[in-house]
Amino acid sequence: MNSFNKDEFDCHILDEGFTAKDILDQKINEVSSDDKDAFYVADLGDVLKKHLRWLKALPVTPFYAVKCNDSRALVNTLAAITVDCASKTEIQLVQGLGVPPERVIYANPCKQVSQIKYAASNGVQMMTFDSEIELMKVARAHPKVTKLVLRIATDDSKAVCRLSVKFGATLRTSRLLLERAKELNIDVIGVSFHVGSGCTDPETFVQALSDARCVFDMGTEVGFSMYLLDIGGGFPGSEDTKLKFEEITSVINPALDKYFPPDSGVRVIAEPGRYYVASAFTLAVNIIAKKIVSKGSDDEDESSEQTFMYYVNDGVYGSFNCILYDHAHVKPLLPKRPKPDEKYYSSSIWGPTCDGLDRIVERCNLPEMHVGDWMLFENMGAYTVAAASTFNGFQRPSIYYVMSRPMWQLMKQIQNHGFPPEVEEQDVGTLPISCAQESGMDRHPAACASASINV
């Protein structure tokens, strides 16, 4: 595993008393009046804290879903802990950071033949499938494959982004696929599922685990000795969601004990993406243009008061693609608190491109702002930078990485000596102290001793 180099990624180590918000304010004050490009401040310490929180709440090895945010410094941080991928490019990224192939799962059930061959030539053996055609394709393109995982469909009707409409085998089809794999002498080592991104009902996991147990039993009947269960993602990554992470894990843990108890010999993994990165990234955008829409104008209903349209230097073709593809609802914040008696106006916020679709916020209340002023958007780490384009010639925002000194020291300890059996409370604030001992769990997460990646 390559070590994280703070100089390579220009990671600023925060002295005691300083926060990521201080760096963000500093960057805003540093830029000249003519150079106010949008930028991110990413707190890598927040990512590490999320990992510690995971280890306390859920006895499952996390494979970070690289597709969620593939910024190199972030992936390098998680590669020192744990990671997951879905394409040749993501495999190249994580292996370039020193992640060994045995800790990579190619978790895309629909793969291009050339990319299957690339995985084979680079030692990646663990991958998913959900159809006979995919099974045959993998058998031909990767003859030495020994570790296939059967993706099953789940009820993801309560998810923000549904996946089972595209991926997953039914229970009936699962038996047929297992029988076909046995005929081809291909080893199926386990089962995977995904309840959908942005899951809003933790009970969905219970039914999915019950279905997975059923498929495991089918595998035993067919002649397989399956030992891997992948429970996918769907975990919240910020505190502004209705369903909290611990509310989900409080439902998952009893279900795991029921269907896959610690003495079952089944290794349980997951593919969290949003959970790790959403809250770590804050985006700063600058107002580049402003339009006043007066009462009775052609642009506004006659009954309305004066409103403002603000145009900023990032939009839905850039970081805010999450609005279109991830159903995100973003809220602008101001770097400085408005005066108590300041008047608020109905406002809309637009991106910089020539497309009328490039609208970030349809309506919100803001004090009157001016060209050159800044707006902040929190919780912008998930499905933002990874899918941003340069449409119309607008460049992606720069990313400034920060980490507190205690978290930096903990990161180096993890890289040099593995995860410590105990982490001092002052290192992580209010977060958990150890991998599993503090939680009262019998099942210890394998992530305490190793790191992995979901491709």
UniProtKB/Swiss-Prot annotation:
Annotated protein name in UniProt: Ornithine decarboxylase
Organism: Cricetulus griseus
Pfam families per UniProt: Orn_Arg_deC_N, Orn_DAP_Arg_deC
GO molecular function, a single term: ornithine decarboxylase activity
Binding annotation for pyridoxal 5'-phosphate: 197, 234, 271-274, 383
Cofactor(s) needed: pyridoxal 5'-phosphate
N6-(pyridoxal phosphate)lysine modified-residue sites: 67
Subunit and partners: Homodimer. Only the dimer is catalytically active, as the active sites are constructed of residues from both monomers.
Function summary: Catalyzes the first and rate-limiting step of polyamine biosynthesis that converts ornithine into putrescine, which is the precursor for the polyamines, spermidine and spermine. Polyamines are essential for cell proliferation and are implicated in cellular processes, ranging from DNA replication to apoptosis.
Keyword rRNA-binding attached: no
Lineage, broadest ranks: Eukaryota, Metazoa, Chordata, Craniata, Vertebrata
Superkingdom of the source species: Eukaryota
Modified residue annotations for Phosphoserine: 297
Residues at which substrate binds: 325-326, 355
Residue numbers carrying S-nitrosocysteine: 354
Site annotation Stacks against the aromatic ring of pyridoxal phosphate and stabilizes reaction intermediates: residues: 194
